[in-house]
Amino acid sequence: MAGQRGACTMSDVVERSLEGPLALTTDKSSQKRGDLVEILTGEKVKFDDTRLSLILQNGLETLREENALTDVILCVDVQEFSCHRVVLAAASNYFRAMFCNDLKEKYEKRIIIKGVDAETMHTLLVYTYTSKALITKQNVQRVLEAANLFQFLQLVDACASFLTEALNPENCIGILRLADTHSLDSLKMQVQSYIIQNFVQILNSEEFLELPVDTLYHILRSDDLCVTEEAQVFETVMSWVRHKQSERLCLLPCVLENVRLPLLDPWYFVEMVEADPLIRQCPEVFPLLQEARMYHLSGNEIISERTKPRMHEFQSEVFMIIGGCTKDERFVAEVTCLDPLRRSRLEVAKLPLTEHELESENKKWVEFACVTLKNEVYISGGKETQHDVWKYNSSINKWIQIEYLNIGRWRHKMVVLGGKVYVLGGFDGLQRINNVETYDPFHNCWSEAAPLHVHVSSFAATSHKKKLYVIGGGPNGKLATDKTQCYDPSTNKWVLKSAMPVEAKCINAVSFQDHIYVVGGAMRALYAYSPLEDSWCLVTQLSHERASCGIAPCNNKLYITGGRDEKNEVIATVLCWDPEAQKLTEECVLPRGVSHHGSVTIRKSYTHIRRVVPGAVSV
């Protein structure tokens, strides 16, 4: 079984073997291409026809379709499938055991198959004879269960990979249950990891309350559990116990030991934990309460598994101000990380290639593009760094160079969609371009996607619900456009949507809640676009123009950084738009004005902190 799981499919072997021309040769380097011929002596040759396996496979499928030479009929529901015993036995250990041992099915012409429907059986038989199977959202569970039953292990793995890619907060518990039922350990581990990373979005689902105790235990004990405060973990445990209180109250002590009670706010611990009726009637948890009390009373001197903060409690959501240009046209190498909640600044690594002793050797990062994918920051292009692409790893605080762009550019944008990075449009030094490149992080390679409808630079771009949006920009050096271009990766096509209220370039956009917010250029306003309604609205007026400013969401608010006003003076203020209060306020003042910079949001380990005071001129 292990050997089957790791083996290549027949079609894989054929594809590789047919890559080169067919030739009769004694060159050993070519022995793996086409039809292989090795001269052993002057009188002997060894012939290896690598195409024969494909011919056999196609021939067997044709025989099945024509019902020729079949020797067994599989009866599923009311449908019958004529097959060849030898093919079934060769492909599946289940059928090998059935036909090669002294079982009654070995001698029967018609065999009734239970536990699978006819449509799924047809899918498995097509796979058996062709090594191909169509897996969809509608059939993946049935195909997985049947493949597991008949021991088509590679098909099981394919279904598991499909489910892993389809994970979301609504279906992950169901997929976890499926993995547990069929002992799919690898899939189970991946789903548990997904739940740990998306804990807050998942814990409110009804299915979460049905988790078995061992699974809940594994999730809650993880250091990587993604919560902002331990109170969320405590409340989850109590909700889970109350859901089936009569049978779960006895499990409270073992589950509660995974809650880091010492890290709770002392007021919350007294008012919400110690006062909870279920806690009070369960003496077995009292030692855990005592540990938390002593931790608070001793000045945090007690050390245990429950006094160690989770990884995400060391992190904070921050927005980064990356590079750019100052009032005297000096290029900024620093990356400023601001935490609005804690009013603090985090020091991070300077931009790459900017720390040479000679100033003339340093790269000048300006009019580049940046985006965040999986908490890593990607930057690309720029006037002096046209083909360069780097990513910032926040866990090690370093920039790492990755594969170059195929087409160098600046005044472009980067957007993340479907786990890939898109580089859109821009200026190549001669003209505005409509080229779109897509980066695959797994293979570290770029490929082309459908080009933009309109060649633009200095535009705004973002992704929203499985589509890309390119807004405004300059089709040439003098003009601006109001066009909204929308890309659907499922069709690889661009279409035009409702135009912006004004023509604008040197603008930026961000997807936030149900809208796309656009700011910058000469607009003196913050606009919002609704992809659902395909309509625009004015959000709020600005006191000045903010051409080439940055915008980023952070802690459920929007932050507008820097830019240039109508006098071409750089701006140092950071504005905050609060959607709940519908209010625009000044958050703080940067050490220096900056424009043409990047602005993104990440979660950053909370180390090397310096204070930022509202209205201060430096940090």
Swiss-Prot record:
Q: Which InterPro entries match?
A: BACK, BTB-kelch_protein, BTB/POZ_dom, BTB_POZ_KLHL6, Kelch-typ_b-propeller, Kelch_1, SKP1/BTB/POZ_sf
Q: Entry's SUPFAM superfamilies?
A: Kelch motif (SSF117281), POZ domain (SSF54695)
Q: Where are the Kelch repeats?
A: 318-365, 376-419, 420-466, 468-514, 515-556, 558-604
What factors induce this protein? Up-regulated during germinal center formation.
Q: Is Repeat set as a keyword in this record?
A: yes
Q: Which GO terms describe its biological process?
A: B cell receptor signaling pathway; germinal center formation; response to bacterium
CDD domains registered for this protein in UniProt = BTB_POZ_KLHL6
One Pfam annotation reads: BACK
* Start and end residues of each BACK domain: 172-274
Describe, from its UniProt entry, the tissues in which this protein is expressed.
Expressed in embryonic blood vessel endothelial cells but not in the vasculature of adult organs. In adults, detected at high levels in hematopoietic and lymphoid organs.
What outcome is recorded for mutants in which this gene has been deleted? Mice show impaired antigen-dependent germinal center formation and B-cell antigen receptor (BCR) signaling. The number of mature B-cells is reduced.
Record keywords? Kelch repeat, Repeat
Q: Repeat: is it a keyword of this entry?
A: yes
Q: Where is the BTB domain?
A: 70-137
The domain of life is Eukaryota
Its function? Involved in B-lymphocyte antigen receptor signaling and germinal center formation.
Q: Write the protein's name.
A: Kelch-like protein 6
Q: Which organism is it from?
A: Mus musculus (Mouse)
> What gene makes this protein?
Klhl6
